[in-house]
C-alpha cells in the first residue's frame, strides 16, 4: 500500500480574467521509504503540489483531485480540523531560504523547543521543560550540529545558510514525520553545503525509513539522490521514471533538453559557442498553447501535437509525447 497516492490533481487560481489552471491532472504515488524527485522550471507548479499535499491553500485556490490518499485515508473527505491534525502528525515541510523562515528576534534554541509537539512527550508533565531541552539537543546532534550550546544561544543571522537549513530540518523532524517535503532545500548554497544537506536527508531516509519528496529545478542533482523523478512542464507531468533510466534514456523532448542544458566541464567548448537551450520561453498560464504545451518550442513537433498527449508507457517509465525519443534502445 503506498504512503501517498494522488490521481489527477488540479490546482486553479481565480483571477480577474477567470479561473487559471496552474497544475493540470498531476498523478503521483509515493511508497514508504522512497526518495522521490520533482523537477521543473520556476512556475511549473512544484511548490503548489507540495502545498496542496499539506493542505495549505489560499482563498482564491480551487484544489480538486480524483484521489488524494495518505496511508489509505482520503484527505479530500476530511474536515479542515481533521486534515490539519493528520498532516501535523505525519508530514513536515522544509522551505527554501531558511533564514527568512526563522524568527530573527528569537534565539534558535527557543524556536526549536517551541516547535517540539507536546504529543511526542510520554513522561510526567512537570518534567516536560527539561525533556524539551534534551530533545532539542538530540535533534541538533541528529542533523550534524555538534556544538549545540553555541547554536542554541545564537540568533538566526549569526549562523550560516547551511547551519540555518540544518536547524530547519531539525524543526521538521521534531514531530517524527513519515513524509518529509523538501522544497529546494539547498537553493543558493555552496556545492559543499548542498552535499552535506543531501547526505543528511539520505541518512534520515535510511535510518528512519522517512519518505522524502525532493523539489528542485536541478535535474543533475536530483538524479544523484532520488530513486524516481517526476518531470513537470507548465503544470503537467511530462515524464516519470527511475533516476538512472531518466538520465540515460529520456523519452520526452523536454527531459532531453534539461539533460543537454547541463554544462559539461570535462571537454572544452569553442569560443562563444551557444549553450543547449530550447527556443522561445515558457508560455503564460493565461495563454497556454493548444495540445502539447511544449509544442511551440519543441524541435520534434508535428501536426499531431495539437492533440494533448496522455501519459503512456511501461509501469516504471511514463511519458506524455506523441513522438517519444530513444524508443529503439529499449
Swiss-Prot record:
Gene3D superfamilies: P-loop containing nucleotide triphosphate hydrolases. One of its GO terms (biological process) is peptide transport. Residues 6-259 form the ABC transporter domain. Disruption phenotype: Loss of resistance to protamine. The keyword ATP-binding applies. GO terms for cellular component: plasma membrane. Induction: Part of the sapA-sapB-sapC-sapD-sapF operon, RNA detected in mid-log phase cells. The keyword Ribosomal protein does not apply. PROSITE patterns: ABC_TRANSPORTER_2. ATP binds at residues 40-47. It is a peripheral membrane protein. Keywords: ATP-binding, Cell inner membrane, Cell membrane, Membrane, Nucleotide-binding, Peptide transport, Protein transport, Transport. GO terms for molecular function: ATP binding; ATP hydrolysis activity. It is found in: Cell inner membrane. PANTHER family: OLIGOPEPTIDE TRANSPORT ATP-BINDING PROTEIN APPD, PUTRESCINE EXPORT SYSTEM ATP-BINDING PROTEIN SAPD. Involved in a peptide intake transport system that plays a role in the resistance to antimicrobial peptides. Belongs to the ABC transporter superfamily. NCBIfam families: oligo_HPY (TIGR01727), PRK15093.1 (NF011674). This is Peptide transport system ATP-binding protein SapD. It comes from Salmonella typhimurium (strain LT2 / SGSC1412 / ATCC 700720). The lineage of its organism: Bacteria, Pseudomonadati, Pseudomonadota, Gammaproteobacteria, Enterobacterales.
Amino acid at each position: 500500500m503506498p504512503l501517498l497516492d494522488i490521481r489527477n490533481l488540479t490546482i486553479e487560481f481565480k483571477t480577474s480574467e477567470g479561473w487559471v489552471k496552474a497544475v493540470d491532472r498531476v498523478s503521483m504515488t509515493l511508497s514508504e521509504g522512497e526518495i522521490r524527485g520533482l523537477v521543473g522550471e520556476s512556475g511549473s507548479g512544484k511548490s503548489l503540489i507540495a502545498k496542496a499535499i499539506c493542505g495549505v491553500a489560499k482563498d482564491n485556490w480551487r484544489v480538486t483531485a480524483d484521489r488524494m490518499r495518505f496511508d489509505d485515508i482520503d484527505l479530500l473527505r476530511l474536515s479542515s480540523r481533521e486534515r490539519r491534525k493528520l498532516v501535523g502528525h505525519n508530514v513536515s515541510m522544509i522551505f527554501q531560504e531558511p533564514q527568512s523562515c526563522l524568527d530573527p528576534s528569537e534565539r534558535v534554541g527557543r524556536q526549536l523547543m517551541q516547535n517540539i509537539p507536546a504529543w511526542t512527550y510520554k513522561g510526567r508533565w512537570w518534567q516536560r521543560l527539561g525533556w524539551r531541552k534534551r530533545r532539542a539537543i538530540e535533534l541538533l546532534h541528529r542533523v550534524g550540529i555538534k556544538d549545540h550550546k553555541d547554536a542554541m544561544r545564537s540568533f538566526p543571522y549569526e549562523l550560516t545558510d547551511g547551519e540555518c537549513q540544518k536547524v530547519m530540518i531539525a524543526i521538521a523532524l521534531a514531530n517524527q514525520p513519515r513524509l518529509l517535503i523538501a522544497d529546494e532545500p539547498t537553493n543558493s548554497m555552496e556545492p559543499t553545503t548542498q552535499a552535506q544537506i543531501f547526505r543528511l536527508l539520505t541518512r534520515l531516509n535510511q535510518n528512519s525509513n522517512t519518505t522524502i519528496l525532493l523539489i528542485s529545478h536541478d535535474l543533475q542533482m536530483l538524479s544523484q539522490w532520488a530513486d524516481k523523478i517526476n518531470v513537470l512542464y507548465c503544470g503537467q507531468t511530462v515524464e516519470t521514471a527511475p533516476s538512472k533510466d531518466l538520465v540515460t534514456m529520456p523519452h520526452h523532448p523536454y527531459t532531453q533538453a534539461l539533460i543537454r542544458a547541463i554544462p559539461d566541464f570535462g571537454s572544452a567548448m569553442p569560443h562563444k559557442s551557444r549553450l543547449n537551450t530550447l527556443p522561445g520561453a515558457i508560455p503564460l498560464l493565461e495563454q497556454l498553447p493548444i495540445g502539447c504545451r511544449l509544442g511551440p518550442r519543441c524541435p520534434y513537433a508535428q501536426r499531431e501535437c495539437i492533440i494533448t498527449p496522455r501519459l503512456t508507457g511501461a509501469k516504471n517509465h511514463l511519458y506524455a509525447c506523441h513522438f517519444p525519443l530513444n524508443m529503439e534502445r529499449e
